[in-house]
Amino acid sequence: MQTYLTLLETLLTTGVDKSDRTGVGTRSLFGYQMRFDLAAGFPLLTTKKMHFKSIVYELLWFLSGNTNIAYLNQNGVSIWDEWADKNGDLGPIYGKQWRNWAGRDQIHQVLTSLKTNPDSRRMLVSSWNVAQLEEMALPPCHVLFQFYVANGRLSCQLYQRSADVFLGVPFNIASYALLTMMMAQQADLELGDFVWTGGDVHLYRNHFAQAQEQLKRQPYPLPKMHIKRAKSIDDYVFEDFLLVDYRCHAAIKAPVAV
């Protein structure tokens, strides 16, 4: 994941200092892209320990269409707690938009197209439902993703409008890489690339020291991901995912900007 470390270094050395909604302040740049060959390994950061369980359970939660944190909490995942209301609800965020945007199941539509019309340029899933943004606890940061098939290989590109590079981006890369692997499996396709594209790409000011610490670390080889094939995209469970040969440096704690 040297590609990610290059982004950290670029932000620290050439980014622009800006104010932001949270009041913490950021150093940011606009427009950045990284590419990961999924056949070469699972792009899970090795220069700090990542909480793999949270990545998997959150993705399964999105795919279920659920927007209440009860399922996450029951499985020891607390990453959405700060934004939930007293009942655990988050409003019509990612899962709702993916699986039921005005009655449309975007995930099912893309899977159908992958199987029947893989050259389509319309294989997109969007979470940016303008009519419902004010009902969401947090407007989508990872807004839109598109699939592309070439030579029997499935690739995915994500557009992330707001990218918290230290905490959020490594998590998002792994999550969408995993989703791409699941979609490829369900559509009987080989693995292509995961392309991450960021809009406002930023480091919070209270993450500078952590980023500098991470830059001192040498990346390890990427782990492998083994997925037991489920009957459908809706039938995967946590136990279907096996992370193999994940060697990493120690975790680096950093505060979440709410």
Curated annotation (Swiss-Prot):
SUPFAM superfamilies the record matches: Thymidylate synthase/dCMP hydroxymethylase (SSF55831)
PROSITE patterns: THYMIDYLATE_SYNTHASE
A single cellular component GO annotation: cytosol
The keyword S-adenosyl-L-methionine belongs to this UniProt entry's keyword annotation: no
Binding positions ((6R)-5,10-methylene-5,6,7,8-tetrahydrofolate): H51, D164, A257
Location (main, coarse): cytoplasm
Enzyme class: transferase
Gene3D superfamilies listed in its UniProt record: Thymidylate synthase/dCMP hydroxymethylase domain (3.30.572.10)
Compartment list: Cytoplasm
Record-annotated active site: C141
Binding sites annotated in the UniProt record for dUMP: R21, R121, R122, R161, S162, A163, D164, N172, H202, L203, Y204
Pfam entry (one): Thymidylat_synt
GO molecular function, one term: thymidylate synthase activity
Catalytic activities: dUMP + (6R)-5,10-methylene-5,6,7,8-tetrahydrofolate = 7,8-dihydrofolate + dTMP
Family listed: Belongs to the thymidylate synthase family. Bacterial-type ThyA subfamily.
HAMAP family reported in the protein's UniProt record: Thymidy_synth_bact
Assembly description: Homodimer.
UniProt name for this protein: Thymidylate synthase
Species the sequence originates in: Dichelobacter nodosus (strain VCS1703A)
Underlying gene: thyA
